[in-house]
């Protein structure tokens, strides 16, 4: 009897070892092949974006700064300004202009050269009387700061000269001409009785399309509402480049407030 048990144990032990080793092998994932490694690496690169910070300035009781987010190949994804929550309190009781530079990556990949942030404490009657509430004018300029500051007041011919047909959106109408800013263009559905919480204003100078300007009221920006809207585009563009087709307003989980341009398309 003992011999039989010993004989069974002799064969049972190797069998158990084989079963244990087999089970252990099943617990390990299969090795990644060179082909799947390359494919996974490529997929990772496709989803990779880089954000570059521009100027940071004091606004109200907080700060604001510019930024650009690009793909790994340098294609612009989002360009804009971000405000800390404190920046929306302690603002001046009179109008206040600010200037912020973009990171050089933005200058290389978009037509925009600098951002002019305008705080309008009591609103203003123009364009077309729709902006009487306290708001921010966020102008993305396609010209240098020096060129912009040299824009003369009307009746100088250069500020009154309009772009050729097709170089501004067909559903925008020309409006106020302001020194150091240029000629404003507003959507043609505005009326003097319209009260605007947010929209897109465009600009021109000396026959050229020179800025895009999301306008957002203080109350809208502070509310944390999310907005993402397309805006009308010209039929033609004087210079090749990546131009945005949407403006966005939103708030993140850290209570930072954003006004940005996205959906860049090569023109």
Can you say where each PLM-predicted feature lies in the sequence?
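Bacterial Sec-dependent N-terminal signal peptides
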Residues: 1-5, 11-48
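Residue-level detector of alpha-helical transmembrane segments in integral membrane proteins
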Residues: 6-7, 162
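Metal-centered catalytic cores of metalloenzymes
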Residues: 28-267
């Amino acid at each position: 009897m003992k011999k039989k048990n010993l004989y069974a144990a002799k064969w049972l032990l190797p069998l158990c070892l084989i079963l244990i080793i087999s089970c252990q092998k099943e617990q390990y994932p299969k090795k990644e092949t060179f082909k799947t490694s390359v494919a996974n690496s490529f997929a990772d690169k496709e989803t990779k974006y880089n954000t570059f910070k521009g100027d940071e300035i004091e606004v109200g009781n907080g700060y604001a700064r510019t930024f650009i987010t690009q793909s790994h190949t340098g294609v612009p994804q989002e360009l804009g300004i971000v405000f800390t929550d404190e920046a929306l309190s302690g603002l001046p009781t009179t109008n206040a202009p600010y200037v912020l530079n973009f990171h050089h990556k933005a200058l290389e990949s978009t037509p925009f050269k600098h951002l002019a942030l305008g705080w309008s404490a009591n609103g203003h009657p123009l364009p077309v009387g729709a902006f009487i509430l306290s708001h921010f004018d966020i102008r993305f300029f396609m010209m240098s700061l020096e060129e912009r500051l040299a824009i003369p007041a009307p009746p100088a011919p250069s500020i009154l000269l309009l772009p050729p047909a097709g170089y501004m959106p067909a559903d925008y109408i020309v409006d106020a001409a302001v020194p150091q800013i240029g000629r404003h263009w507003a959507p043609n559905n505005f009326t003097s009785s319209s009260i605007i919480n947010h929209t897109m204003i465009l600009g021109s100078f000396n026959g050229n399309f020179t800025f895009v300007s999301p306008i957002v009221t203080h109350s809208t920006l502070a509310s944390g509402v999310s907005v993402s809207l397309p805006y009308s585009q010209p039929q033609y563009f004087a210079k090749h480049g990546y131009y945005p087709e949407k403006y966005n307003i939103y708030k993140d989980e850290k209570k930072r407030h954003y006004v940005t341009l996205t959906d860049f398309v090569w023109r």
